[in-house]
Regions:
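Active-site-adjacent beta-strand anchor residues
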Residues: 7, 251, 301
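Glycine-rich phosphate-binding loops that contact phosphosugars or nucleotide phosphates
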Residues: 33-171, 204, 251-297, 311
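Active-site phosphate/pyrophosphate-binding segments
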Residues: 2-39, 129-247, 257, 319-336
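Conserved phosphate/anionic-ligand binding catalytic regions in large, soluble enzymes, centered on
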Residues: 3, 44-53, 208-220, 305, ...
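In a subset of proteins, long, contiguous C-terminal domains/tails are tracked
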Residues: 56-64, 222, 284, 299-336
Length: 336
C-alpha cells in the first residue's frame, strides 16, 4: 500500500529536511518576528500542524500565534487584523477552504507564508513566501509523511527565530528508523481493535494536537469512532464514557505533562477501559505499551504520531478496509 510506504519514508523526510537549507525559512522567520499578529490556518491534518505551531512558537520563542480552521475563517473575517501574517498550510496547495482563507486575508493586506508540498499549486502562487515540504508525492488519502514534513518546516522556523534551539535531525531520523524496524506489537494491538466501536486518545500540552491527529487517522483508515481529548478535561465529561468496551490511547512522553497524564490513565483504568500507552517510559497502568524513542521534547509529536499511523494502517487491514483510499474522502478537497 502507498500509505505504508509513505509512513516508512518518514525517516528520510526528517533526514533530508535536516540536511537541506529550505529557501525562505529566514524570510519567513523575519516576517513572523516583525508581525503585528500571526494566524495559522489549514484543514484536517494541516490544521493539527497549526495547533502544534502555536505551542512551539509560544514555548520556545515567546511568539503568540492563533490557529484558525480554514473553513471557519471565512465566517469570521473580522477576527483577522489588517497587516498581519497568515501561515497557510496545505499538502496539495489546492484545498478550497485554505485558498478562500488566503483570499480573505490578502484583502486585509496580510502577508502569506505558504507551507505546501505541490509547488505548482495555487497556494504556491498566492504565497509571499513559499516553504516547500519537499517530501515527494503523497498518494494515500490520509496524510502521513506530509504531516511530518510540515512540522519539520515549522521547527526550522522556530530554530531560526530562537537562540540555542538545537534539533538533531540525523539522530532523530535514526531513532525513528529503529522504531519502524519492529512493529509486531502494533500489529498485535491492531487485532484487538477489530471489534471496538470507540477509541479515545488523551494528551496534554503539545501532545493534545497529536491526540486529535491520532483520532483523525483512526477515523479515516478504520472507520472506528475516535476522539482526541485534553487530559485535564477528563472529569469535565469524557470520564462518563469510560467503561469495559472502550480502548483509550494515552499519549504520555516523559515531559512536564507525564505525571498528570499517568494519573488520568489510572482513573480511566479504574473504570475498566483498556489502555494503550504511547510513551518512552513503561508503566503498569498500560495494558499495551508502544515504546517511542527518548528524544528532545520538541520532537515528541512526530515520534508519537508515527506508531499511531501504523496502528491505524494495520487496523484497517484487520477490518478489510482500503487504507489508501478511505470511503467518501478525497486527497485534495477542492470544493467546499
Amino acid at each position: 500500500h502507498f500509505t505504508l510506504k509513505e509512513i516508512y519514508e518518514q525517516p528520510d523526510v526528517i533526514l533530508k529536511a535536516g540536511q537541506t537549507t529550505v529557501d525562505g525559512i529566514e524570510d519567513a522567520a523575519d516576517l513572523i518576528k516583525n508581525a503585528k499578529n500571526i494566524y495559522i490556518t489549514g484543514s484536517g491534518t494541516s490544521y493539527n500542524s497549526a495547533l502544534i505551531a502555536k505551542q512551539i512558537l509560544s514555548k520556545y520563542v515567546k511568539i503568540k500565534a492563533e490557529p484558525i480552521i480554514a473553513s471557519e475563517l471565512q465566517f469570521a473575517p473580522e477576527t483577522i487584523e489588517e497587516n498581519s501574517v497568515l501561515i497557510a498550510i496545505s499538502q496539495s496547495g489546492e484545498s478550497a477552504d485554505v485558498l478562500e482563507a488566503v483570499r480573505i486575508t490578502k484583502k486585509l493586506n496580510c502577508k502569506i507564508i505558504s507551507i505546501v508540498n505541490l509547488l505548482t499549486s495555487s497556494l504556491t502562487r498566492k504565497g509571499d513566501i513559499v516553504l516547500g515540504m519537499n517530501c515527494g508525492p503523497e498518494i494515500g488519502v490520509a496524510a502521513t509523511k506530509s504531516f511530518t514534513a510540515q512540522l519539520i518546516l515549522l521547527y526550522k522556523i522556530v530554530q531560526k527565530l530562537g537562540e540555542n534551539i538545537t534539533i538533531g535531525f540525523e539522530e532523530f531520523s535514526n531513532s525513528i528508523s529503529k522504531m519502524l524496524e519492529n512493529t509486531n506489537k502494533i500489529q498485535e494491538i491492531a487485532k484487538e481493535l477489530k471489534e471496538v466501536s470507540d477509541i479515545y486518545i488523551l494528551g496534554r500540552g503539545i501532545n493534545y494536537p497529536i491526540a486529535i491527529e491520532s483520532a483523525l487517522k483512526l477515523k479515516e483508515l478504520t472507520y472506528i469512532h475516535a476522539e482526541g481529548i485534553p487530559g485535564g478535561e477528563l472529569k469535565h465529561g469524557p470520564l462518563a464514557l469510560m467503561d469495559t468496551d472502550v480502548f483509550v490511547i494515552i499519549i504520555n512522553p516523559n515531559d512536564s505533562t507525564y505525571a498528570d497524564t499517568l494519573t488520568s490513565a489510572r482513573e480511566i483504568k479504574a473504570r475498566g477501559a483498556k489502555i494503550i500507552g504511547v510513551s518512552d517510559i513503561e508503566s503498569d497502568v498500560y495494558d499495551y505499551w508502544i515504546e517511542i524513542p527518548k528524544i528532545s521534547e520538541i520532537l515528541y509529536p512526530i515520534s508519537e504520531i508515527i506508531p499511531i499511523q501504523l496502528l491505524a494502517y494495520y487496523s484497517a487491514l484487520e477490518k478489510d478496509t482500503d487504507p489508501d483510499y478511505p470511503r467518501n474522502l478525497a486527497k485534495s478537497v477542492t470544493v467546499k
